Regions:
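N-terminal signal peptide c-region/cleavage motif recognized by signal peptidases
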Residues: 17-19
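Asparagine-centered strand-capping/turn motif at beta-strand->loop junctions
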Residues: 47-51, 165-173
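Surface-exposed binding patches on compact interaction domains or structured appendages
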Residues: 27, 50-98
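Short, solvent-exposed loop/turn segments enriched in Ser/Thr/Gly
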Residues: 38-44, 98-100, 114-118, 161-163
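Beta-sheet-dominated interaction scaffolds and their linkers
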Residues: 23-52, 91, 150-160, 195-198
Length: 229
């Protein structure tokens, strides 16, 4: 039989996962890099090979334009001079048990509104040593990078139409909405509501179980507040 290799790359979109996710033989220290104002404009992602074979890793940055809206697009970020984002190194070779870091850094001034990037960190095919047909399955991470403005604003507008709640981020930075809750008129039946990252200019609609007030917590980085709609 002729030797051949079939390589499949699968992407796990794990931007909302907690730190320390593991897929196959590659472990990342974090899957969200939040470059907040007042903090150093850089952060590191540690990549760890916890398998017993050498792995080859690539880190490819993309810019997400109009995130969270119907006009959302994804485009290669280009050079650091073009994109304002440095990702280095973009190629790694990790021996079994080896750990390396990928630096994510803002180049230049902070933007007036969020800039959103994804960095696809994934194993790539190396030499195939199998003497028969081989199937290699690689799973990578689409890590999220948020470049925040110098003066983030946190406005969210809420509108109710019957049991439809519409939320719109009218500020200049993404907010995480979580711990949503609504109770019936008696207060005896309370329901948890879904979480959402709401980007600037984005709108989110959901159908509520009741007609009563809704509460959410929202966060920008470590700062949180309660909101009522």
């Amino acid at each position: 039989m002729t030797r051949k290799a079939l390589t499949i790359t699968l992407f796990a979109l794990l931007a909302l996962a907690p730190a320390g996710p593991a897929v196959g033989e590659m472990v990342l220290s974090q899957v969200i890099v939040d470059l907040l104002p007042g903090k150093p404009p850089r952060d590191d992602i540690e990549v760890w090979n916890d398998g017993d074979e050498r792995i080859y890793v690539s880190a490819e940055p993309f810019e997400i334009r109009a995130p969270g809206t119907p006009a959302e697009t994804r485009a290669p970020a280009g050079t650091p001079e073009e994109s304002g984002l440095l990702v280095a190194p973009q190629r790694l070779i990790l021996e079994p048990g080896e750990r390396r870091t990928i630096r994510i850094a803002l180049i230049g001034e902070r933007p007036p509104s969020d800039r959103v990037f994804r960095v696809a960190i994934k194993p790539v095919a190396g030499p195939v040593s199998a003497s028969t047909d081989a199937l290699k399955v690689f799973v990578g991470y689409d890590t999220l990078v948020l470049v925040r403005p110098e003066g983030p604003t946190s406005e969210i507008e809420g509108q109710r139409a019957g049991r439809t709640l519409t939320l719109r981020n009218t500020g200049n930075t993404a907010q995480e909405l979580f711990d949503g809750r609504q109770c019936d008129a008696s207060g005896a039946d309370c329901r948890a509501l879904p979480a959402k990252r709401l980007y600037p200019g984005a709108t989110w609609k959901q159908i509520l179980p009741f007609d009563a007030e809704v509460t959410y917590r929202s966060s920008i980085g470590p700062e949180t507040r309660e909101r009522r709609f």
